[in-house]
């Protein structure tokens, strides 16, 4: 614990304001100014999606284990790796579950986010996902309203208000405040899948002077969600909602999470301190945890070199519950140095990482080369990282096995060709996991910690036909073929051998710009696979047991119509339109959890400058 305390003390010392420092102009202006593309129809559509995994599905080599419903533990996998290796960040806060370690996409304030960025170099990450809040122009008071209604009694509302004052209590500088609230409820497609409560509260305030700024943020989440263990029966009977039954219909998962963040920004460094608390319970079994962490970042520029130095540390303790021993602790310290060397035609990025997790030190690194040669943009990336530590217990629902300290090495590359509105990018990847921790289902609702050694590989292509800024035809396609070498666990095909996703649409502007239309069809398809099973007590996606029914090859189509009326956006989404028809009885991506059939949603997104 002494190295961790020393690291936190260093953060506190570095957090002292530096006299006469000057914040770059871009930093000052970027705090609360809406980017144009974020206030467009595409930005509004991000608010309409269940979570950010729909956006992540466009990343080369990625696949989404989807449930098609709000608040369910949808998981994103890339390069054939376990979904648990992804490290999600909300600003500088690690946003994986404090207890189970899975990324909590469902707890993000989705309607208020910028588009996520993939960064394998984030602390603690094999694959990192960085998310940030959208910002609002507060020179005038600003309000956003977002309402959704849909099938199975869906009701969802999000409201945001932000404003600014140049003086408060006689103090110089700018005070900027933001308040947002979100609530949702839905009956669910099957018994035992009801979202009984979803509440979210976001508060952010910022005090800014010319030389420095201090920001405080608070995010609160509550969830109470049905947690059945799968639809019973075999064949087409499982897709008949009138007669289908589920296992564990009355069971629920309950969660409360609070995140507090303080960030000091100067010209020389950015220092953040955060406190996260969380409780998670399933049928009386659960625990509560508290995590205290800090981050310090500094950028340098030496000639063509752009250096970025970052230090992260946290300590965590189980404060109550029966799923894990009270007082059980975990800690992490990580130091990174990143150098980006600029060339006339591209750049070379090198990153070195040293990480201590629960007392064990492990090195890591990343190397990326990217170039622009006329209309050709090749890239190549290599990375090596320690595998994340597994959950060590969850009462009777998890058996602690022998999990060794593992590592994961990845290589990917591709070539982008851009010709006017058309672009094409063939790509390939290979990943090798050595003794990577995972979870294997023994029987339904009971899993064991295991470690696996395997190699995955694949190749794919991305096509894009861009529309004009506000009108015309557009199309996107992301298709890949994958394979897995011999595995120590002989787990079978957890990832489809081929899968694709795409969108075809048309934009139009009518009545001299007062009405903007965007109509499209979204689709995805996948091959037969064993897939990953849902462990209902924790929400983890695990290697399934023989009791699970394999997933058949199938597809899903969605119809999306958006209309921009002055500043407001109205949209209708009709999801999985062929399921439950003569074309197909049903489909699923996670064994025994069919995707909702012919599910519609209606929404209104309305930013107001008041």
Cite the ranges covered by each PLM segment.
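Short loop/turn motifs that connect adjacent beta-strands in outer-membrane beta-barrel proteins
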Residues: 136-141, 166-175, 208-211, 264-272, ...
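Extracytoplasmic beta-strand/coil segments of soluble accessory domains associated
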Residues: 23-26, 53-94
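Short strand-turn segments of transmembrane beta-barrel domains in outer membranes
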Residues: 128-166, 189-191
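Transmembrane beta-strands of outer-membrane beta-barrel pores
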Residues: 120, 147-151, 183-187, 209, ...
